[in-house]
Swiss-Prot record:
<dbReference type="Pfam" id="PF13286">
    <property type="entry name" value="HD_assoc"/>
</dbReference>
<protein>
    <recommendedName>
        <fullName>Deoxyguanosinetriphosphate triphosphohydrolase-like protein</fullName>
    </recommendedName>
</protein>
<dbReference type="InterPro" id="IPR006261">
    <property type="entry name" value="dGTPase"/>
</dbReference>
<dbReference type="GO" id="GO:0008832">
    <property type="term" value="F:dGTPase activity"/>
</dbReference>
<dbReference type="GO" id="GO:0006203">
    <property type="term" value="P:dGTP catabolic process"/>
</dbReference>
<dbReference type="InterPro" id="IPR003607">
    <property type="entry name" value="HD/PDEase_dom"/>
</dbReference>
<comment type="similarity">
    <text>Belongs to the dGTPase family. Type 2 subfamily.</text>
</comment>
<dbReference type="InterPro" id="IPR006674">
    <property type="entry name" value="HD_domain"/>
</dbReference>
<dbReference type="InterPro" id="IPR050135">
    <property type="entry name" value="dGTPase-like"/>
</dbReference>
<dbReference type="InterPro" id="IPR026875">
    <property type="entry name" value="PHydrolase_assoc_dom"/>
</dbReference>
<keyword id="KW-0378">Hydrolase</keyword>
<dbReference type="Pfam" id="PF01966">
    <property type="entry name" value="HD"/>
</dbReference>
<dbReference type="InterPro" id="IPR023023">
    <property type="entry name" value="dNTPase_2"/>
</dbReference>
<feature type="domain" description="HD">
    <location>
        <begin position="62"/>
        <end position="198"/>
    </location>
</feature>
Length: 376
């Protein structure tokens, strides 16, 4: 049974374009299915998480990451008697707007778009789901519920300054109440993302031999996990050890998140969803001690993994590809597919740049590499 402060699909604020309710799926389940059936969702399997898609078969990509985030989000929401369907749906959609080549690709495209209001993967997710996906005759996008769109846009908190151009424009026709917090389910999806990526980036980095267990000792709490596991399992292999460490890490993070969130619910005496939105802080959270551990782990990953020689070398190649493609399309729009070229408003430079950015952002790693090799 859903809590009184949960997002109830029967009380959804609805869709921009009204539709007849489905007889066997609730509104958030319908949204989940719509997202899964988008072209953008399928392309995630060929988009970088940390390691380039062709670097190895077992490294995570944007699709596997999104599935892992959705699993964590669903479990946490279920335990708190919140809408697991909504939490899962937001989690599945949270990375749809990412460029090829992960954050290196996004930084490169944002630099290309510096004179055209920049590029944001979060805003791009909204744009994909409300404009760029063409699956219905009656409208652009996939016509998701207000709650899902709110969660995608505001899962990291209220947006009160430097509002992205597309988010601001869309908000005029469908007010997402940008100055408030999103639902508890959206907040869960955001922290499920943190739990998943710090855990699994550690795992993948060990597998790629970018870091080892000696360097992991810099994280004292992780070193304690390693010591306890080696003491319990004398002959444990390195490959099994990292799986056990990640399992322990995820369990402790999820347990901590549940405890602190329940404390906040009780402290604030929350009875309905609007009270969550109007709080002056994020309701769903970790304890202060765990937040410090997460910050420490993110710093470790940034210094030891994302700035490592291997990842830096790959990032430089990816930057060259994205910037090269942007330049070649800006120089000659006839190189764009006809259906994309038709979206440009009379060859006006701002419109041209935005359409090109949308096109490049939608590419998979391998498609971008192929296009670069053909055109640059």
């Amino acid at each position: 049974m859903l809590a009184s402060y949960a997002s109830d699909p029967l009380k959804s604020r609805g869709r921009l374009y009204k539709e007849i309710p489905n007889t066997y799926r609730n509104e958030f389940e319908r949204d989940r299915d719509r997202i899964i059936h988008t072209n953008a969702f399928r392309r995630l399997q060929y988009k970088t998480q940390v390691f380039i898609n062709h670097e190895g078969d077992h490294y995570r990509n944007r699709l596997t990451h999104s599935l892992e985030v959705s699993a964590v989000a669903r479990s946490v929401a279920n335990t708190l008697n919140l809408s697991s369907d909504l939490a899962e749906t937001i989690a599945l959609a949270h990375d749809l707007g990412h460029t090829p080549f992960g954050h290196a690709g996004e930084r490169a495209l944002n630099a290309c778009m510096r004179d055209y209001n920049g590029f944001s993967h979060n805003a791009q997710s909204l744009k994909i789901l409300t404009l760029l996906e063409k699956r219905y005759a009656a409208y652009n996008g996939v016509n998701l519920t207000w709650e899902v769109l709110e969660g995608i846009v505001k899962h990291n908190g209220p947006i009160t300054c430097e509002i992205n151009e597309y988010i601001a424009e869309y908000n005029k026709q469908n007010d997402l109440e940008l100055d408030t917090y999103a639902s508890a389910e959206a907040q869960i999806a955001a922290l499920a993302d943190d739990i998943s990526y710090i855990s699994h980036d550690l795992e993948d980095s060990i597998g790629a031999k970018i870091i080892d267990f000696n360097s992991l000792a810099e994280l004292k709490y992780i070193d304690q996990y390693v010591f306890a596991l080696k003491s319990k399992f004398k002959n444990i292999s390195s490959s099994c050890l990292i799986y056990e460490v990640v399992r322990k890490l995820m369990h402790e993070l999820i347990t901590d998140l549940l405890w602190q969130t329940k404390e906040n619910l009780n402290k604030e005496k929350i009875t309905d969803i609007d009270e969550i939105r109007n709080l002056n802080y994020q309701l769903v959270d970790f304890t202060a001690n765990t937040n410090e551990r997460i910050k420490e782990t993110k710093k470790f990953l940034h210094e030891r993994v994302y700035k490592s020689n291997k990842i830096t070398a790959i990032s430089l190649k990816c930057t060259k590809i994205v910037q090269g493609l942007f330049k070649v399309y800006m120089d000659d729009i006839n190189l764009l597919p006809v259906n994309w070229k038709m979206l440009i408003d009379s060859n006006e430079i701002y419109s041209k740049a935005r359409v090109i950015a949308d096109y490049i952002a939608g590419m998979t790693d391998r498609f971008a590499i192929q296009a670069y090799n053909q055109l640059c």
